[in-house]
Structure formats: C-alpha cells, structure tokens
Amino acid sequence: MSRIGKKPVPLPKGVTASISGQTVEVKGPKGTRTFSATDDVTIALEEGTVKVTPRGTSKRARQQWGMVRSQVENLVTGVTAGFKKELEITGVGYRAQMAGNVLKLSLGYSHDVNFEVPAGVTVTTPKQTEITVEGIDQQLVGQVAANIREWRRPEPYKGKGIRYKDEFIFRKEGKKK
C-alpha cells in the first residue's frame, strides 16, 4: 500500500500557502488556487511545508490521506510551473487555428468545429497541426485537451485524427484480398 501521504509537500520560494479549516489556498507567480479537503484528514502548515495527516484509521481516511496530499502538490506545481498538454493533428486537410477565444478545427467534417476555450486555460496553435493547452489547473487542462481530442480520435488504420504528442496509436492491418 502506498504511503505517499507521509511525505510533506515543500513550498518553493515565491509560493505561499494559507489554511483555513479544511481549505488550502496556494498563491504563486502564475496565480492562486484553492482546494477543499474532506473531514477525514487534517492539513497543517509546518516550516515551509504542508503536512497532511489522517484523522483516525478508517479505510476512507487512509485513502483521502494520499489523495489530498497529491492534490496539494498539484496546487503548488500549478502556481509555479503550470501544466501543459500538447496535441498533434494528423490527416490531409486537418488543421487548427485560434480566432479570439475560439479554436477553429477543420477535421474532415462538412463544417468547421468551433471549440470555445474555457476561462483558466490558454490554447495556442504554434503550427496548423499542433495545439498546446496550458493552465494552472491540472484537471481543467486535461479535460480541455480530452474534449478537443474527442472531436476526431485517432483511427487505427491510417492514424488520422487528434492525438496527444506522446501517444502511441496501435495500427491495424487493412483487409486482404
């Protein structure tokens, strides 16, 4: 069983944390993030670190212990370095471009797909076939990238579609005569 919760979360220079009840607020150079923990754990600020301890020995308390510690670590990472997902578009005529707060995708449909970018996330297109999603909220960055990818998932025969930069597409052989 993992004991990731035992390890305290260090606060780098330029990052401050404040705890009020079960809510942790982390401020850093990229912004401010908050997280509300369950009553199964206790959160304390000790000597430049955030320490999470379980209340009791129940299974739920032990589960929340590691999860809350990981969430606090993600808050610190988000306000210092941020999170980034890169997508690649593969296919003839498939391309993307930003127009204000809308990502326009040409994906082989009879119409262009207009994807509204939510607040808290920055989407850029360095090339017509590359999309970069950045932000301080790991869950939101991942969800936006997944929503963009969902418009045209990579297919296994030619590999056409939108995929993550490091994703491997298992290729299938076509029919034989």
Curated annotation (Swiss-Prot):
Key words, A-Z: Ribonucleoprotein, Ribosomal protein, RNA-binding, rRNA-binding
Origin superkingdom: Bacteria
Record keyword Ligase present: no
GO MF annotation terms: rRNA binding; structural constituent of ribosome
SUPFAM superfamilies in alphabetical order: Ribosomal protein L6
A Pfam short name: Ribosomal_L6
HAMAP family tied to this protein: Ribosomal_uL6_B
Subunit field text: Part of the 50S ribosomal subunit.
Record's function text: This protein binds to the 23S rRNA, and is important in its secondary structure. It is located near the subunit interface in the base of the L7/L12 stalk, and near the tRNA binding site of the peptidyltransferase center.
Protein name (database record): Large ribosomal subunit protein uL6
Species per Swiss-Prot/TrEMBL record: Cereibacter sphaeroides (strain ATCC 17025 / ATH 2.4.3) (Rhodobacter sphaeroides)
Gene name tied to this protein: rplF
